Amino acid sequence: MRTLWIMAVLLLGVEGNLFQFEKLIKKMTGKSGMLWYSAYGCYCGWGGQGRPKDATDRCCFVHDCCYGKVTGCNPKMDIYTYSVENGNIVCGGTNPCKKQICECDRAAAICFRDNLKTYDSKTYWKYPKKNCKEESEPC
């Protein structure tokens, strides 16, 4: 619970990418990104290690890898341009770096939506990082 409170406080002042990512997750899944994905498995939330535990956790692994490939801007803070057209997220703007951040977030939000049935809160919500010791696979 303390972790959620800290994250909520941190997000209050955020107007950049993490806030936008939360909106995209909500739009695609109907779920709160902070409440559903901030402390799930080995990769959802801050940092990540080991092997993804299920398809939902793999969405976070792929998202982390995607952010790792972004250069020239800050994936967690920079604001990007997007719209939602007929239920689809469309990344816009002319800045290629910010567009890449948007595409990372878009892909993750869609992945969460497509894998809602794999979400296992009883097993993987607040999953102890000490159980994420397997060797990580490459991005």
Curated annotation (Swiss-Prot):
Pfam families: Phospholip_A2_1. Disulfide bonds join 42-139, 44-60, 59-111, 65-139, 66-104, 73-97, 91-102. It catalyses: a 1,2-diacyl-sn-glycero-3-phosphocholine + H2O = a 1-acyl-sn-glycero-3-phosphocholine + a fatty acid + H(+). Its main location: secreted. One of its GO terms (molecular function) is calcium ion binding. Acylation causes dimerization. This is Basic phospholipase A2 APL-D49. It comes from Agkistrodon piscivorus leucostoma (Western cottonmouth).
